[in-house]
Amino acid sequence: MEKKTGTTTVGIKLKDGVVLAADTQASLDHMVETLNIKKILPITDRIAITTAGSVGDLQALARMLEAEAKYYQFTWGKPMTAKAMANLLSNILNESKWFPYMVQIIIGGYVEEPTLASLDPLGGLIFDNYTTTGSGSPFAIAILEDGYKEDMSIEDARELAIKAVRTAGKRDVYTGERKIQVITITKEGMKEEFVEFKE
């Protein structure tokens, strides 16, 4: 079987924090391989990354970023900011452009301020208030465009992110809609949850 994969990941930045959401379905051709893949990985207690693409590549990049964050903390005595980590990740991806990591990444965090960025496989870096990646992006971005407000609460952003991923899952066969991983990051820290739907 040819391995065809897809997903939808979403990021929303607010004045009080960042919300990341992703489906948990992995596909093998036209078959659902599992409903329990974590597509959002914490790097520190204040920064996480999502991926659309190769989960193995994401895991390798996450290990690199974790090591760099620990080294930075040890060297400078303070945590690496999400903006600095996004720039570091951009450089790592760009250095590998001839043998690219097969990923589209969203990085979000709150160290000194809320930060959200998306990166393409060659290291292209865009900081934004909201973004999506993956095969369900055309559906998810429409929900974000319609519902995003700069002054919205974390809870409203969480609901919007879940709605965006679920909507994508209803229209994109490679995005799951039954279980959604959500990570919320504020100045108080990070909270991870899994939201499940019966239908």
Swiss-Prot record:
Quaternary state and interactors: The 20S proteasome core is composed of 14 alpha and 14 beta subunits that assemble into four stacked heptameric rings, resulting in a barrel-shaped structure. The two inner rings, each composed of seven catalytic beta subunits, are sandwiched by two outer rings, each composed of seven alpha subunits. The catalytic chamber with the active sites is on the inside of the barrel. Has a gated structure, the ends of the cylinder being occluded by the N-termini of the alpha-subunits. Is capped at one or both ends by the proteasome regulatory ATPase, PAN.
Top-level taxon: Archaea
Propiece residues: 1-6
Main function: Component of the proteasome core, a large protease complex with broad specificity involved in protein degradation.
Transcription is among the record's keywords: no
Species lineage: Archaea, Methanobacteriati, Methanobacteriota, Thermococci, Thermococcales
Name of the molecule in the record: Proteasome subunit beta 2
Catalytic residues (UniProt): T7
Localization, UniProt: Cytoplasm
Class of this enzyme: hydrolase
A GO molecular-function annotation: threonine-type endopeptidase activity
Species this chain originates from: Thermococcus sibiricus (strain DSM 12597 / MM 739)
Gene: psmB2
Activity: how regulated: The formation of the proteasomal ATPase PAN-20S proteasome complex, via the docking of the C-termini of PAN into the intersubunit pockets in the alpha-rings, triggers opening of the gate for substrate entry. Interconversion between the open-gate and close-gate conformations leads to a dynamic regulation of the 20S proteasome proteolysis activity.
Entry keywords, A to Z: Autocatalytic cleavage, Cytoplasm, Hydrolase, Protease, Proteasome, Threonine protease, Zymogen
